[in-house]
C-alpha cells in the first residue's frame, strides 16, 4: 500500500518498543496524528531529551541525568550501610514503591551467562568489588531474578562478599500474596517451604 514515507518511518520507529508489533505501531501512529498531535510533540521532546541527557549513575549504574543519582547522594541512604543488587533499573522502581528499603543500590544491567559470553566484568562486578573494598557496608541484599542465571549471579556475588567480610542475603521467593497453592509451580513451592519462618505471638 502506498502511504506517506514519514508515516511509515514513524510506525517502524514505534516498533522498537517491547511488545509493539505492526498493528499496535499503526494504531499508535494514527492516534497521535489524528487525535493528539500536542501529545506527540511532548513525547518527541521528552524522548529526545531523555536519549541525549540520561546516562548512568557513577555509583550504582542506574539511569540518571546527574553524575550521581538522588538515591546514592542521599546522606541517610549512605549511612544505612546496605546495598541492594538488582538486574535492571526497573527493579529499583519496583522496590522503591514498596517503601521497605532505605539503603542504596547496585544495578548489574543483566546477569552472568557464560553461554552468551557474559562474564563478571560485563555486568560491573569489578565496580561492585571496589565498593565492597572501599565502603563500610553491613549487608548486601541480592535481589536478582529467580532464574538459573539470576541464582548463579547471586551465588557469585555472595562469594565475593564473603571475601570482604560483608554479609550477603537473598530476597525470599515464594507463594504470591492472594495466590492459591494449587496454581503455584513446584519450584516456587519448594522455595516457599525451604524459606518458611516461625510465627511469633
Swiss-Prot record:
<keyword id="KW-0233">DNA recombination</keyword>
<dbReference type="GO" id="GO:0006281">
    <property type="term" value="P:DNA repair"/>
</dbReference>
<dbReference type="Pfam" id="PF02132">
    <property type="entry name" value="RecR_ZnF"/>
</dbReference>
<keyword id="KW-0479">Metal-binding</keyword>
<dbReference type="Pfam" id="PF13662">
    <property type="entry name" value="Toprim_4"/>
</dbReference>
<dbReference type="InterPro" id="IPR000093">
    <property type="entry name" value="DNA_Rcmb_RecR"/>
</dbReference>
<dbReference type="InterPro" id="IPR023627">
    <property type="entry name" value="Rcmb_RecR"/>
</dbReference>
<keyword id="KW-0863">Zinc-finger</keyword>
<feature type="zinc finger region" description="C4-type">
    <location>
        <begin position="57"/>
        <end position="72"/>
    </location>
</feature>
<dbReference type="GO" id="GO:0008270">
    <property type="term" value="F:zinc ion binding"/>
</dbReference>
<feature type="domain" description="Toprim">
    <location>
        <begin position="81"/>
        <end position="176"/>
    </location>
</feature>
<keyword id="KW-0234">DNA repair</keyword>
<dbReference type="InterPro" id="IPR006171">
    <property type="entry name" value="TOPRIM_dom"/>
</dbReference>
<dbReference type="InterPro" id="IPR015967">
    <property type="entry name" value="Rcmb_RecR_Znf"/>
</dbReference>
<keyword id="KW-0862">Zinc</keyword>
<dbReference type="GO" id="GO:0003677">
    <property type="term" value="F:DNA binding"/>
</dbReference>
<dbReference type="InterPro" id="IPR034137">
    <property type="entry name" value="TOPRIM_RecR"/>
</dbReference>
<comment type="function">
    <text>May play a role in DNA repair. It seems to be involved in an RecBC-independent recombinational process of DNA repair. It may act with RecF and RecO.</text>
</comment>
<keyword id="KW-0227">DNA damage</keyword>
<dbReference type="GO" id="GO:0006310">
    <property type="term" value="P:DNA recombination"/>
</dbReference>
<protein>
    <recommendedName>
        <fullName>Recombination protein RecR</fullName>
    </recommendedName>
</protein>
<dbReference type="Pfam" id="PF21176">
    <property type="entry name" value="RecR_HhH"/>
</dbReference>
<comment type="similarity">
    <text>Belongs to the RecR family.</text>
</comment>
<dbReference type="Pfam" id="PF21175">
    <property type="entry name" value="RecR_C"/>
</dbReference>
Amino acid at each position: 500500500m502506498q502511504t506517506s514515507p514519514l508515516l511509515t518511518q514513524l510506525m517502524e520507529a514505534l516498533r522498537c518498543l517491547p511488545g509493539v508489533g505492526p498493528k499496535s505501531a499503526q494504531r499508535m501512529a494514527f492516534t497521535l496524528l489524528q487525535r493528539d498531535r500536542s501529545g506527540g510533540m511532548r513525547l518527541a521532546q521528552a524522548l529526545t531529551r531523555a536519549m541525549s541527557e540520561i546516562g548512568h549513575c557513577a555509583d550504582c549504574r542506574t539511569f540518571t541525568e546527574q553524575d550521581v543519582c538522588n538515591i546514592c547522594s542521599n546522606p541517610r541512604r549512605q549511612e544505612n550501610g546496605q546495598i541492594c543488587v538488582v538486574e535492571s533499573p526497573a527493579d529499583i522502581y519496583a522496590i522503591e514503591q514498596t517503601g521497605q528499603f532505605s539503603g542504596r543500590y547496585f544495578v548489574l544491567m543483566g546477569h552472568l551467562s557464560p553461554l552468551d559470553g557474559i562474564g563478571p566484568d560485563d555486568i560491573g562486578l569489578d565496580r561492585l568489588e571496589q565498593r565492597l573494598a572501599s565502603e563500610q557496608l553491613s549487608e548486601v541484599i541480592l535481589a536478582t531474578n529467580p532464574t538459573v542465571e539470576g541464582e548463579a549471579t547471586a551465588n557469585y556475588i555472595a562469594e565475593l562478599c564473603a571475601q570482604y567480610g560483608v554479609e550477603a542475603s537473598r530476597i525470599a521467593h515464594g507463594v504470591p500474596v492472594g495466590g492459591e497453592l494449587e496454581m503455584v509451580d513446584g519450584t516456587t513451592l519448594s522455595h516457599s517451604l525451604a524459606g518458611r519462618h516461625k510465627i511469633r505471638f
